[in-house]
Amino acid sequence: MADDWESAADSEIVIRPNAANNINKWEGEDDDEDVKESWEDEEEKKDEEKPTKTEAPVKTKPNKALKAKLEEQERLKEEEEQKRLAEMTPEEKLAEKLRLQKIQEESDLKSALETFGVTSIGGGLDAFNPESKEEFKEFGATLSWKVAQYRESIHFPQFIEDLVRSLCCNLSAADIKKVKMSVESLHSEKLKMEKAAAKKSAMKGKGKVSLRTENDDIDGYQKYGNDFTDDYDDFM
């Protein structure tokens, strides 16, 4: 009976392998490698996403040598121009003066046209055929500039008077009155300007300081008969 129990116990005993021993010791290393690779990928993405710093442009200081060279060239150019003018004959100087005057007149005309909002004058006075208000304004600006070229002549005032009279002959009495009022207004403004200029010039003349000397006092006494030289002669 005892033998049966022992045999039964022996048959029931089952040796189970240790689960811990069956675990592959290399298991999990692949997972670690995958985690590391994912970290490396994320780091690379972060590096790519970081904005690249743009270097500020370096401000270069002006080259003093270049500046001095340009100034020297300008000075030499001016000296050559002065030398050229000095070597000119009277006829050449007159021609040069007229050339510069023409340039100045063209500049004045351009300024006058810009004042009236005119961009160009086309082919000159002969090319004008004004019909609208703007066209007459443009024509008037050009004509005024042309006439003003002779303002330095002694005959210019009389010429303007005759011209205005001749033009006003074609106007009605009401229109002539408008012209008269406009000229009178201009006359008042000119009169104020001339008076102010004359007053300013007079004030400058009064500002001159005269030096006072010791002889001024002696001369003053002599006016009243106090001549010290005579007293000295009487004493002697």
Curated annotation (Swiss-Prot):
Residues 61-115 form a coiled coil. It comes from the Eukaryota. It is found in: Cytoplasm. Component of the eukaryotic translation initiation factor 3 (eIF-3) complex, which is involved in protein synthesis of a specialized repertoire of mRNAs and, together with other initiation factors, stimulates binding of mRNA and methionyl-tRNAi to the 40S ribosome. The eIF-3 complex specifically targets and initiates translation of a subset of mRNAs involved in cell proliferation. Residues 1-86 are annotated as: Disordered. The gene is eIF3j. It comes from Drosophila mojavensis. HAMAP family: eIF3j. Signal peptide: none annotated. Belongs to the eIF-3 subunit J family. This is Eukaryotic translation initiation factor 3 subunit J. InterPro entries: eIF3-like_dom_sf, eIF3j. Residues 47-58, 68-86 have a biased composition (Basic and acidic residues). GO terms for cellular component: eukaryotic 43S preinitiation complex; eukaryotic 48S preinitiation complex; eukaryotic translation initiation factor 3 complex.
